Amino acid sequence: MNERDGFYLTPSQSGHPFAPTSATLTSSQSGYPTAVSTTLSRADSRSNTALAKAGDVGEAIWYNKCTDYVHKIIRYYRCNDMSELTPLMIQFINTIRDMCIDSNPVSANIIKRAQSDDDIVRHLIGLQKELRQNSVAEAIGSDFNIFQPSFVLNSLPAYAQKFYNGGANTLGKDALNEAAKQLSLAVQYMVSEAVTCSIPIPLPFDQQLANNYVTLLLKRATLPDNMQEAVKSRSFVHINMINDLINAVIEDLFAGGGTYYYYVLNEKNRARVVGLKENVGFLAPISASADIFNYIAQLATQQGKRPDMFENAAFLTAAAHAINSPAAHLTQSACQKSLSQLAAQCETLTRFVFMIMNHNTVPTTRG
């Protein structure tokens, strides 16, 4: 009983004694219950609104993360761009793909237009003859010659739509003119440079491969098998220059070299290297500490380290034996690798054939 007000307090049946949503007060004289409203209901409504807003924000964050991940997967399958994918994400993608392949196939209606490769070749030849007009390709004398009007009418609009149209759905005349202007300047400059240097214009594959290699290295992404083979073969000049530069920096900084490559480092790493050399030079004479690798090896040997007979730096740092090697996360079998390479080659050949057909023919006008 409340001695001050003369009422009996009956808590609500909500089960929470400290936060009742309502209270029933009973008069000690009349015995009739009296309902008194409290402000707790409004507080609960405000808290529920805040929780709902927090839940919406959390759902939006997860939605954005999932959408971003899906975009990365789509870009990976369309452009083979793995620069923003971690090894765990690639393994997750491969797991989903394997699950879809191993699961029961979905029934679909497919119209088979060709029974064999010969039928496909005959279809392409017939299509080429159908699109050809006035024997334009034969008059040029070479099927690989792009200096003809059909290239401007077929291939150039696709290039202008991709890079100079500003994202519009329809191709504008200004975008086509700008693309033609830029391509003309680029070809003229490359021809002039080639004649000046007595070096023919190379195919862009080497430079594009080097750009992809640098991008993957900066992103610490998994290197594809073809990229690893290109690095091992040392058949590409730009990739060799990148690897030689990295090795030259390490040799110059830690193996008795000079200070030539200091400007390559940022201020933080430059200070670290200078401080490391000063500290090592303080611990030992300059003649003994010039090569930091040998100095550390001598200290370890003096402390009792005995290297194994078959242990060497090449074995320990080889990609196949490294724990954090990108190859450790690749679980493709030989059959899967062969199928992937065949699929890439098939798509490349298909695009190449259609590109030749496009710039070797002029579209016909139908009345």
Swiss-Prot record:
Keyword Transcription among record annotations: no
Localization per record: Virion
Highest taxon listed in the record's lineage: Viruses
Gene Ontology cellular component list: virion component
Record's comment on post-translational modification: O-glycosylated; contains N-acetylglucosamine side chains.
DNA-binding in keyword set: no
InterPro entries: Baculovirus_Gp41 (IPR006790)
Record key words, sorted: Glycoprotein, Late protein, Virion
Broad class of where this protein is predominantly found: virion
Pfam families: Baculo_gp41
GO molecular function, one term: structural molecule activity
Region listing for Disordered, in residue ranges: 1-31
Biased composition (Polar residues): 10-31
Record-stated family: Belongs to the baculoviridae gp41 family.
Protein name: Structural glycoprotein gp41
